[in-house]
Amino acid sequence: MTHREVGISSVSELGQMVRAVRKESGLTQRDAAALCNVSLPFLNGLEQGKATAQIGKVLSVCNRFGIDVRLRLPGETA
């Protein structure tokens, strides 16, 4: 799998990335939710950019799709 780096600054942008990777994987939301062990409403909310998503579940979904979430702390360079 090739990787590309994408910066995000909102829950909405993260949801868009999750949706794009899910679709690239050829999965329906229902199948992806089962694969990630989350509910269909949760995955739908994440993809819609709802700010109420639980970070643990968000990270689980990202991890399952190979989305590496990184933090850039102040003072660090790229």
Where are these regions (language model features)?
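N-terminal flexible/basic segments that precede or flank functional cores
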Residues: M1-E13, Q48, N63, D68, ...
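Residue-level detection of the helix-turn-helix DNA-binding "recognition helix"
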Residues: K23, N37, Q48-K50
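Short amphipathic helical patch at the helix-1/turn junction of helix-turn-helix
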Residues: S12, R22-K23
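Residue-level recognition of specific faces of alpha-helices
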Residues: S10, M17, F42-G45, K57-V58
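Residue-level signal for the short linker/turn that defines the boundary of a DNA-recognition helix
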Residues: Q16, G26-L27, A53
